[in-house]
């Protein structure tokens, strides 16, 4: 009888559509809420090029913090047995405009085999313009643990699965992407070989901030009313004309709560905050936050903050 790994998790049942169902499930929200406490967001700079992330079990925050610092000799990583990595799910978010050229490559590697090459079928390459995305990588074997150390870049580590990420084709110098890896991993005394699961990459729809756009539209109305109530001329003979870029065909006319004041030659417009009915809500993993402000210091009132998952 052949031994084949079976999983009841959402991720490995009907892999072609399980990611979508998992992303919308209560289980995912609970997983992300729990995992987010570990500060798992990893930033990848285009100038740095590459970033390795060692996949270790997360037993507690202190344990994870020590492990991510490669302090493997504290007894947190056994030297005997096997590392069993069931799956690794990585969310990738861009910090560049959608039109930006460039791509990101994410790979699952085993330093005991090669520190430069990915495991077969464990590599995904996607354009920065295709982000955000969710990527799943699954190995088909368990890794034996030992005391001997291997060199990974400028650090030493014992043989462990790790993620390798590289941004290329982007000429900027800042942070190009952020990663949020979530994985299921444990150590055990038995080992096995598993049916190969190919890498999966699923696109995530960008958030439509329609309610935010409504706030911007209302701010335009406030600004328009403020401009129309200004004097028709100022020193120098310049006249205020009706702003041509503002829509005048709104079904709802908001009262002007703006005031103006002059400080020397500078003229400022103070815009009142909208009422409660104008506040917008961004639904994202059920997370609520504090007030949100728009650019130029114009506050639009309290609302929920948007968090990625």
Curated annotation (Swiss-Prot):
UniProt keyword terms in alphabetical order: Host cell junction, Transport, Viral movement protein
UniProt entry tagged with the keyword Transport: yes
Gene Ontology terms: biological process: transport of virus in host, cell to cell
GO cellular component, one term: host cell plasmodesma
Subcellular localization, as worded in the UniProt entry: Host cell junction, Host plasmodesma
Positions of the UniProt region annotated as Disordered: 245-273
Annotated transmembrane regions: none
Domain of life assignment: Viruses
Pfam families membership: 3A (PF00803)
Composition skew (Polar residues), residue ranges: 246-262
InterPro entries documented for this protein: MPV
Role noted for this protein: Transports viral genome to neighboring plant cells directly through plasmosdesmata, without any budding. The movement protein allows efficient cell to cell propagation, by bypassing the host cell wall barrier. Acts by forming a tubular structure at the host plasmodesmata, enlarging it enough to allow free passage of virion capsids.
Protein name in UniProt: Movement protein
Species whose genome carries this gene: Pelargonium zonate spot virus (isolate Tomato/Italy/1982)
């Amino acid at each position: 009888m052949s031994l084949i790994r079976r999983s009841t998790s959402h991720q490995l049942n009907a892999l072609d559509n399980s990611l979508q169902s998992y992303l919308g499930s209560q289980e995912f929200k609970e997983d992300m809420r729990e995992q987010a406490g570990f500060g798992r967001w990893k930033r990848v700079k285009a100038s740095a090029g590459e970033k390795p992330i060692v996949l270790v079990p997360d037993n507690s925050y202190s344990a994870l913090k020590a492990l991510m610092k490669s302090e493997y000799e504290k007894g947190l990583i056994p030297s005997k047995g096997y590392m069993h990595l069931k799956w690794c799910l990585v969310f990738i978010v861009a910090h560049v405009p959608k039109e930006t050229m460039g791509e990101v490559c994410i790979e699952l590697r085993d330093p005991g085999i090669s520190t430069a090459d990915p495991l077969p079928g464990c590599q995904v390459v996607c354009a920065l313009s295709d982000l955000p995305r969710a990527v799943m990588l699954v190995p088909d074997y368990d890794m034996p643990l030992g005391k001997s150390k291997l060199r990974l870049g400028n650090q030493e580590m014992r043989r462990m699965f790790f993620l390798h990420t590289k941004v290329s084709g982007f000429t900027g110098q800042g942070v190009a992407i952020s990663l949020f890896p979530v994985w299921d991993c444990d150590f055990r005394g038995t080992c096995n070989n598993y049916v190969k699961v190919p890498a999966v990459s699923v696109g995530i729809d960008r958030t439509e901030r329609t309610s935010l756009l409504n706030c911007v539209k209302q701010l335009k109305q406030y600004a328009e009313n403020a401009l129309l109530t200004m004097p028709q001329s100022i020193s120098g003979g310049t006249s205020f004309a009706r702003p041509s870029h503002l829509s005048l065909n709104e079904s709802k006319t908001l009262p002007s709560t703006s005031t103006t004041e002059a400080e020397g030659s500078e003229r400022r417009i103070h815009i009142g905050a909208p009422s409660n009915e104008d506040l917008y809500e961004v639904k994202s993993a059920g997370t609520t936050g504090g007030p949100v402000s728009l650019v130029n210091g114009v506050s639009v009132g309290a609302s929920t903050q948007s968090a990625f998952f």
